[in-house]
Amino acid sequence: MKKLSALILIATAMVTFTGCKNSSQTANPLLETWNTPFGVPPFDRIKAEHFKPAIEEGIRQHNAQIDSIVSNTEIPSFANVIEALDRSGQTLTNAYTTFSLLNAAESNAQMQELDMELSPMISAHFDNIYLNDRLFNKVKAVYDQRDQITDPQQKRLTELIYDRFVRAGALLTPEQKNELKQVNEQLSTLGVQFSNNLMADNNAFTLVIDNPNDLKGLPTSIQTAANTEALNRKKEGVWIFTLSKPSLIPFLTYADNRELREKMYKAYLERCSHGDSSDNSKIINQIVKLRLDKAKLLGYPSYAALALDEEMAKTPENAYALLDQLWQPSLELAKKELEEMKAIKKAETGDDSFESWDWWYYAEKVRKQKYDLNEEELRPYLSLSNVLQGIFQLSNRLWGITFRPVSVPVYHPECVAYEVLDKDNSHLGILYFDFYPRPGKQGGAWCGTYRDAHYENGKRVAPGVTIVANVSRPATKNGVALLNLDEAETLFHEFGHALHSLFSQVKYTGLAGVEQDFVELPSQIMENWAFEPAMLRMYAKHYQNGAPMPEDLIEKIRRSSLFNQGFTTTELLAASLSDLDIHTITEYQPIDLNRFEKQMLNEKRGLMPQIEPRYRYPYFSHIFGGGYAAGYYSYIWAEVLDKDAYQAFVESGDIFDRPTAESYRKNILERGARYGALQKIPWPRTRYQTVDGRSWIDRGGDRLHRCASCASRYGCTQCLDPSHYRRDRHHCKIGLLRPSPYGKFQ
């Protein structure tokens, strides 16, 4: 996931690190020049108490810069209005970006209280900027003369900034602006409350097992990890499982004790919906109402209409069109998978009744039966070190870039950092990794930046990028972290986001972003390499003796790539539809979230009760605590793009083809928002203007289509004829996304 900074409200703010000359503030590292290697944040000196005064000082400085732009008596120009805006807010961006990154990865009660205080402060500050009539008049004056701007990036930035002002309410009446300010302030606070509640509920639950019989079925490595978790909590003689994915998913997959699987899954499923202080139901209702109020103030019938107006999809109807065309084929395949699992369950127990907490357990039995593959036998070849080196080797083969470990300040002892060097050995940026789950860290995985690439005085200012994950810890204190397939693929995914930031070649920070439904293309295209046989031969080595992964295991991975894809796709589509459903409401009435979800998914669309949406509303942090509101469909949308783009590598005859990689880098990864995604760019492999879900399903070369050899509509899972494969990829590969059910996110 691409982590959206809270400063997305003003993408024109520059993230360079300049010193404050106020002597009374010099003890605050956030207000000093960062004389650290590569200008990284001095994490070793930053304390929670530094943030509020630094942000208050940043707001004061930013206001002074805005006043200077407004009071300038010269004729409004790109330089004295648009560029000045893009360069403004440096101190504030410095402080608040650092705060946001730390609050997601290394939070505590003090940081959460600060977030509640700072979020409405930041919201009010940017409202005061965007709703400043005198400032907007200057922006509009430059915008009205934009055809006279000859530099393409300057013209594009002018258009983007004008659009941001309009979408922020610059054309509203004074009364409407005051109402909008109140709405934005409330929304900023509610989003923080939602996230804090979710973190509290995630941390509150533990399953403590004191009877070894209850561990039956669990691999030794999982048992050892649970025992280590207990010892870390000062508890001996027990095993502790938590709701973090490296603990939850293996338990659901392997534990023979059905009652305990049910207990674990219900604890996950019912987060933030117990009617206590962490219940998010009222918060979600308030958010939905306020978002609708905001949309109507700005002239839109629904919040989804407002949100999608600036995206590739343009309208909720277009997003629905893709999801709806994929829904029935995915659901039909999931039903087929269910029947296979029910048959196994009946053969073993005499009972084919099936619940949602049975899916992982019996799906694993299907995988073992059909493909003779146990994911635990893959872990020794997927050590964290090997996977990371594989990603680095792939990047070197595609673009010639290299990664050098560096010693820089970090916010947690487990973090590591690398300098990224281009093929000419020039500095591209700094890349942090934070791999493991811990209390105070949000679940899932994401990529963020504390500094976006831009140019200053003709010189590129390199970005600072961070990848945060929650992969399996080493089972013992001095052990090696051994990943499963999903965790390995997650790192490839987030690394794709990192490359998007590291390769950026835009002059202005306001051009650093792209459309929400385009942003997942760089991440999802990287997933395609993760388990290519040629790629596995490069990095999948046994952690103890360095032996390469046996060819029969590589073949099993390839053959089992069809495994469980009906489920995976259906629960992803269900979450995407839930997001759109609640944000296309045009008249608000109090919502019973559970009832609304069942009506829209189970009753209207036929979702079977054994499958829950990937995220239910009370813990759907992407849309209520993050930047994906009415935008979760973007993962499916970008999947359409990524399969077409990756096919360019396949058709070259070499998935490591350097010319194709350089073209992809130049035309996609470097360009930022220099063009809108719907504008023509010189990269022919992104069919974002002609997305047709049904034809995509039936078309060869994409994820869901009819097998040319056996005519199976949804993939030849039975025949497995070797002739049905080409270039190490299955002809009728099924599944919109390969990640396992809970994928990459919280």
Regions found by a protein language model. Name each.
Residues 702, 721-731:
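Intrinsic-disorder-associated, low-complexity terminal segments enriched in Asp/Asn/His/Tyr and depleted
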Residues 1-4:
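Positively charged n-region of N-terminal signal peptides that target proteins for export
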Residues 157, 189, 196, 200-242, ...:
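Active-site-proximal, well-structured secondary-structure segments within enzyme catalytic domains
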Residues 25-219, 649, 710:
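N-terminal helix-rich structural modules
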Residues 472-491:
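Short pre-active-site segment immediately N-terminal to the catalytic Zn-binding motif
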Residues 23-50, 57, 238, 369, ...:
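C-terminal, non-catalytic "cap/extension" segments appended to globular domains
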Residues 35-50, 99-118, 140-182, 242-282, ...:
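Short His/Asp/Glu-rich catalytic/ion-coordination signatures at enzyme active sites or charged loops
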Residues 16-19:
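C-terminal motif of bacterial Sec signal peptides marking the signal peptidase cleavage site
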